[in-house]
Amino acid sequence: MIRKIKKEVGCSFKENIQYMDQTLPVEKSFDIIRREMEIGGKESVFYYIDGFIKDEAMLKIMDSFLSITAEDLPQDAETFSKQKIPYVEVDVLKCFDDILRNVLSGTAVFFVDGYDAALCMDCRSYPARSVDEPDKDKSLRGSRDGFVETIVFNTALMRRRIRDPHLI
């Protein structure tokens, strides 16, 4: 039996971010967002998929993070999630497999310098339409799937079904 070794989040912020940047095609894909921010005087990086996140919820959460001072910043991710995140659905993740699965399924994940875990917030808003044959441009042969919205909406529809970091 082959056992897969799971990579854990370490204490080195730079190594964690480097691993995420190597695994997710942030530079190649327009809809995988990497947002750097300072929280309480410490570096942090957010990862999420454009088209899945409720913009209003992310704006409120990021605004609340801007008011955190260095003295207010908790020492660990678990305490941070309980005291500083004004959102209900929050998880503390320590395994990169779980982190990547969450990002690719539409949640926002962020790392804070000094924490040995990532924080995951479920601010998802799935596109509400199924992939159907378009009314115009009907095809006689081949696939019946068609996309008629913006490219961000269409890629979110595809990423909802295909959760793969190689999808660019």
Q: Could you describe each region identified by the protein language model?
A:
Residues 1-168:
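Membrane-embedded alpha-helical signal segments
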